[in-house]
Amino acid sequence: LLMVPVMTLRAATAVTWVLLAAQLLGVLALSWSGLVLAFVVFCTPLGRVPVGALGARVIRGRIEAGVYPRGGAVHVRLWAAERWLAASGATNISAAWLVKPLARMLGARIGRGVDFQTLPPVTGLLTVGSGAAIEPGVDLSGHWLDGDELHVGAVTIGDDARIGARSTLMPGTEIRQDAHVEAGSTV
């Protein structure tokens, strides 16, 4: 039942493309303003990012650092928020300049001059200091399953710190100012 809204959102992109094609071929006589609006919201990063982030934030609700039961309310909300974000297309953005706004929309605190090249956590429990650099493929999810427990924690990255590509920052990680985490590391 939780997947019905997610699949509806996913289908909205295809339906928009079909309606646009039908309009261009003269099969339908629809409002151009409505089609352009649907195209911007469902088919471009300018619409997908806010729809995905704000929807995920509403589904997720308030999540605090802690240990929760697997399959419990927090786990299901977190899972559903991740599915919503993926279905919106926000996780497939190739526009790197939209990654920081996506992170902020999810609740992360991002400082000035941050070089952010990876997807932010849906938990919103991320703080990145000014001038920090996060290279591609860094896992900032801030949660993991261990048996029957879901561990959720904040990830904090200090000013001018650098996180190498494909590194994993576990829940509760704090990277201090000017620190350098080598590529492929787990902290």
PLM-predicted stretches and their roles:
Residues 1-107:
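Terminal amphipathic alpha-helical/low-complexity segments used for targeting or macromolecular assembly
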Residues 103-105, 109-187:
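Structural signal for interior beta-strand "rungs" in well-ordered beta-sheet cores
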